[in-house]
Amino acid sequence: MIQKPQMYVYIYLFVLIAAGPVDLNEDSEREANVEKEGLCNACAWRQNTRYSRIEAIKIQILSKLRLETAPNISKDAIRQLLPRAPPLRELIDQYDVQRDDSSDGSLEDDDYHATTETIITMPTESDFLMQADGKPKCCFFKFSSKIQYNKVVKAQLWIYLRAVKTPTTVFVQILRLIKPMKDGTRYTGIRSLKLDMSPGTGIWQSIDVKTVLQNWLKQPESNLGIEIKALDENGHDLAVTFPGPGEDGLNPFLEVKVTDTPKRSRRDFGLDCDEHSTESRCCRYPLTVDFEAFGWDWIIAPKRYKANYCSGECEFVFLQKYPHTHLVHQANPRGSAGPCCTPTKMSPINMLYFNGKEQIIYGKIPAMVVDRCGCS
């Protein structure tokens, strides 16, 4: 007769045989599949975050530049409008698109709207200039509102002088148009200078007009335009005021530099990852924004820049560095939605672009590069 303990053993063995072979790797495979599925979900989440970040950047740029829509300027128009002048070439050639300054200093710029540094203004037509003596004259400049509310540091009028065949002395005169006086006077002098030119190519000449510009800003009604003359010894005018064939980009223009004082704020620290990272915590990932891919030809430089974005989890176990958020959760765990992975430090980019008035602006746009991410 079989005793009870032995009978239990037989029953257990019978159940094992009936159940079939046991796969000892089943649990590990299940765990691997769960982990793989989690990584795929993380990749999809990051892809959605990248797309959202790019769309947000487009909206932010227009908003920070105070543009309702992207300026509609064709590539042909850009080639004609871009002056072939030293200050613009210098901006493009020595262009500091962005710098990785996430480790220097403890303060950062966090103002919202773009801080303008240089504005290049092209001349426009004026009814007053057309009526002066029955034919067009140059030049009339309209000024962006950015200039009126910022401190003018420098204002230069740039004019291009055509090449000469023999050495000559050139007398340059800049006249400001005024309302006709009783004696018929319609002009008053701004600047005059004498320079020697040698045979060869034409040259760019700059003239300080800061005082005149400041007066125009104080009394906009006094801005009726200017007339430019550059006469050689034979009375020939060498100044390019209305470019002819082969003279595209040689228009006179104003280069105005302004300054603004941005606000400052404190910084913190965060994790850096790449697209192949398996890090689940809140982290900064690389992202390059290509303006040419948008069809935004109105942005002269940069054509692309590194924007970066934040993605990852913000579990409360990671919150040793964020005690205020942790305390809120402890006080009301059901009512707290938890922290989000978000930029904790951002830096500006410099941008050279056309605004809606076909003026060339060189400015600094704040908070366009994610330098660090964190949970908050």
From Swiss-Prot:
One of the GO biological process terms: negative regulation of phosphatidylinositol 3-kinase/protein kinase B signal transduction
Domain of life, per lineage: Eukaryota
Disulfide cross-links: C273-C283, C282-C341, C310-C373, C314-C375
Gene3D superfamilies to which the protein is assigned, alphabetical: 2.60.120.970, Cystine-knot cytokines
Entry-listed glycosylation sites: N72
Posttranslational modification: Synthesized as large precursor molecule that undergoes proteolytic cleavage to generate an N-terminal propeptide and a disulfide linked C-terminal dimer, which is the biologically active molecule. The circulating form consists of a latent complex of the C-terminal dimer and other proteins, including its propeptide, which maintain the C-terminal dimer in a latent, inactive state. Ligand activation requires additional cleavage of the prodomain by a tolloid-like metalloproteinase.
Record carries keyword Secreted: yes
Keywords, sorted A to Z: Cleavage on pair of basic residues, Cytokine, Disulfide bond, Glycoprotein, Growth factor, Heparin-binding, Secreted, Signal
Signal peptide: 1-24
Propeptide: 25-267
PROSITE patterns listed in its UniProt record: TGF_BETA_1, TGF_BETA_2
One MF term in the entry's GO annotations: growth factor activity
One GO term describing the cellular component: extracellular space
Family: Belongs to the TGF-beta family.
Role of this protein: Acts specifically as a negative regulator of skeletal muscle growth.
UniProt protein name: Growth/differentiation factor 8
Organism: Rattus norvegicus
Gene: Mstn
